[in-house]
């Protein structure tokens, strides 16, 4: 959303942002992190290079599960091999002291030819789990191998031929073998709860339907979103107590409603999302994905920030090894005016998901919010390296360069962004720091003419940069009228915070339900 992938843009609704956050909130699966993923040819050395001054020792008890190769020869079986890979990630995350890299980062190395040492460095792990899977009728064949990343030596390997009906037992065998090899132990009773993606009945076809739903969720279009919901409903019909499927359905309904629907159809979709979320938590009160889905509804449908924060915090408590849970809570912490706390959480999340371009972007934004602009720019550049095709990520670098006073560099970077609403927004920002006042004025005028409803919050920011508080507060009011998700950035926004002592700032915070107190700094 605004604070996750982009505020508002060319779409008539929250669009990409809502889609990203909604899919982010499928705790333990990471449905659509591929949207923020780097192309496979991004250099591993670039991704592995730490920020200046950062220490990145690789713990011995650390592992990345590379996506199992689909050897069935059928592309429509990709969901099956990916589902098995993700289930292994989830299962290994239940072991205390074992660092398990998230799906977003490890899946970027699908079919990679990079040597194991480069992979280990890029992902920050000492071990790699790789292999292949083939399903032929009622038989599943899996080859798995645990590799020492530093030298490529094999620590454990096994080939399995099992009946399809024994799939869950087979996955458990692999998990136990890897855990034994790494001398890892299951989590204790510290408040965490094993977060299984399997149906409580053990119905394989229900899990299969749920996995298909996740696959279609990744297609990013309304037809596939509806197909995903259909598969989740099929999973529920096969196991009516499948809480995880209800949570996934809730997230998909929010995604569909916020990205592709409007009017009464949108309202009804939100009703269905809320019902599915409630049922997920009724069936399993300790399901992290259920709390995350409820948080999504509270945040971006009800704009209940504190209620959403409580749900995200509970999800993170239940799934402490999940980078996505940490990331979501970190961004909500920043939304509520605690950027220093958010920075710590974002750093923790990045140890588990080091190639997450969006997380690097938000680390940069949040560092800049507390005045650490040099390190913020380094993080923003890392984000651009990892997500080179994202106009939003590129615009984030422009805004940080403006905060550093690098106006020429900011304008040059903005001009390199491909045609997109975020190019227009970046140019509107960058031109304010130059000497061509006519161009600066025209950039704001053009942004208003083309995207007044979709970019009301960004227009308010530009007026803050222009030191025009009257226009800034007028556009903030319009942003609230249109429920612009950019409002979630308010308490970490250096342009808006220039006027934090203006009585209108406290009044606006009260209206939108945010505290008027923040640790962030204003732009001078």
Where are these regions (language model features)?
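Membrane-embedded alpha-helical segments of integral membrane proteins
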Residues: 1-15
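Acidic, proline/glycine-rich low-complexity intrinsically disordered segments
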Residues: 14-17, 27-419, 452, 493-494
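Sec-dependent signal peptide hydrophobic core
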Residues: 19-23
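Helix-coil-helix junctions within alpha-helical repeat/solenoid scaffolds
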Residues: 377-379, 388-389, 393-473
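TPR/TPR-like alpha-solenoid helical repeat scaffolds
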Residues: 399, 427-437, 487-503
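TPR/TPR-like (Sel1-like) alpha-helical repeat modules
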Residues: 415-422, 477-484, 513
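C-terminal structured "cap/appendage" subdomains that terminate the fold
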Residues: 468-497
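Terminal, low-structured helical/coil segments at or just beyond the last alpha-helical repeat
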Residues: 490-524
